């Protein structure tokens, strides 16, 4: 008994698209789940039936009907279809029993099955910048009517008149109420969300949502801001990221590598550390171990001195992505010191310019994007200064790589543990998402269960 009518969530087609940092596709799976959830969680049909059964003082009475009650509301059946350039057609089928005393003086009982139609538009709220649904109309179509009253012309006219007066006022406000319930699930979308205490991320819309034959698409131009107020601009070079081919009907969130790069810029200062009292395997971190790679160190330090290492990150971390693999690039310097007694400042042995490549492993926990890194490679190592004479940096590659893996990577992962916020909309459970690394982007396949 499903109908062809439509609750329309109209997405305005975007014009010239700016370079988005994120793309969201809402397929029929998510939309079905959200509309059904709004109907169930709001209990709106039951509430409307209760209100109809308890009219307010001063309410307009229906001629020929008294003591009206509405009961036995059937669970609604909802079917959705996308309408390109318009929105979503929705069919809501339900039924109920209307009782009362008719003009004949007897008890009346009408069992009715109906479809509700409405046209609603998905707009972008000018003030908040969030999507918002607005209803433009509503109709109630009768599918079947059964009554305990005699079957004659006068009774049939009375039943028809009663239903035409009761049903629109009962069902159409219910549809509006469901839309309001859904609107609340968009309300926090553009609120700034913290990244530890370093800054915030705000998912601003690039343009109003667009509707195709298979999905609604929302383009994001995220605003990344340091705690002090400085905005971090997303890089505009490179091609626009795209969803994988053949996934047009799936609900997906795409986060570009440039957006993730901007977010990690919030954490740059936290990645600069001083390390000491560390071991690489069985090797103690002292000048005697270092002398095995740079013999000149043994001439200066006859007795072993503890080593201190300072890691400085000179550029914001950069994220790159190829199919199946993502790297975090850290450009900076690594300076090694020998500790000295009696409160003296450590002695700088050398400073190396470094380019570190860390492989990123993604997951979602508590609806935040989590990153865990592991050492991929030491992409470059160049001597900037040295107090222990000349040496070949290449001879230190293995030692430095092992040290970074054992001592520095845990620090990086501890910093990343804060997680990166994901768009807060429609109560989407990102913990269920399937993650896929594609060219220049991370794609989250969204699930409802």
Swiss-Prot record:
Subcellular location(s) of the protein: Secreted
Gene Ontology MF annotations: lipid binding
Pfam families attached to this UniProt entry: LBP_BPI_CETP, LBP_BPI_CETP_C
Residues with attached carbohydrate: 115
Disulfide bonds: 138-172
Any single Gene Ontology cellular-component annotation: extracellular region
CDD domains in UniProt: BPI1
Protein name: BPI fold-containing family B member 6
Gene that encodes the chain: Bpifb6
């Amino acid at each position: 008994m499903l109908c062809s009518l439509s609750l329309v969530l109209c997405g305005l087609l975007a014009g010239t698209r700016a370079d988005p940092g994120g793309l969201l596709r809402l397929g029929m799976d998510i939309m079905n789940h959200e509309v059904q959830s709004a109907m169930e969680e709001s209990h709106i049909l039951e509430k409307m039936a209760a209100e109809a059964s308890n009219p307010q003082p001063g309410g307009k009475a229906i001629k020929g009907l008294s003591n009206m009650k509405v009961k036995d509301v059937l669970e609604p059946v909802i079917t959705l279809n996308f309408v390109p350039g318009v929105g979503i057609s929705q069919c809501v089928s339900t039924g109920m029993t209307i009782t009362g005393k008719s003009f004949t003086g007897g008890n009346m009982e009408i069992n009715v099955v109906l479809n509700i139609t409405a046209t609603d538009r998905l707009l972008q709220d000018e003030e908040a910048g969030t999507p918002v649904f607005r209803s433009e109309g509503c109709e109630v179509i009768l599918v079947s009517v059964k009554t305990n009253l005699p079957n004659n012309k006068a009774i049939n006219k009375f039943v028809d008149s009663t239903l035409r007066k009761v049903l629109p006022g009962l069902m159409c406000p219910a549809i509006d109420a469901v839309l309001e319930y859904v609107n609340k699930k968009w309300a926090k979308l553009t609120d700034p969300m913290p990244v530890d205490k370093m800054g915030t991320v705000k998912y601003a819309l690039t343009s109003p949502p667009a509707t195709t034959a298979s999905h609604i698409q929302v383009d994001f131009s995220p605003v990344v801001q340091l705690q002090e107020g400085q905005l971090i601009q997303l890089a505009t070079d490179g091609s626009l990221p795209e969803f994988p081919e053949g996934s047009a009907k799936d609900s997906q969130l795409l986060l570009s590598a440039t957006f993730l790069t901007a977010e990690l810029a919030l954490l740059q200062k936290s990645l600069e550390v001083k390390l000491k009292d560390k071991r690489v395997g069985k090797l103690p971190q002292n000048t005697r171990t270092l002398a095995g790679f740079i013999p000149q160190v043994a001439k200066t330090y006859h007795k072993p001195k503890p080593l201190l290492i300072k890691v400085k990150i000179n550029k914001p971390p950069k994220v790159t992505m190829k199919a199946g693999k993502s790297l975090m690039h850290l450009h900076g310097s690594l300076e090694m010191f020998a500790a000295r007694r009696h409160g003296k400042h450590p002695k700088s042995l050398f400073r190396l310019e470094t380019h570190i490549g860390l492989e990123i492993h993604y997951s979602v926990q508590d609806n935040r994007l989590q990153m865990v890194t592991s050492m991929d490679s030491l992409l470059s190592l160049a001597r900037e200064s040295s107090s222990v004479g000349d040496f070949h940096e290449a001879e230190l590659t293995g030692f430095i790589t092992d040290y970074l893996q054992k001592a520095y990577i845990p620090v990086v992962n501890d910093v990343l543990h804060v997680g990166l916020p994901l768009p807060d909309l429609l109560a989407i459970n990102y913990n269920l998402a399937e993650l896929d690394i594609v060219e220049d982007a991370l794609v989250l396949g969204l699930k409802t269960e």
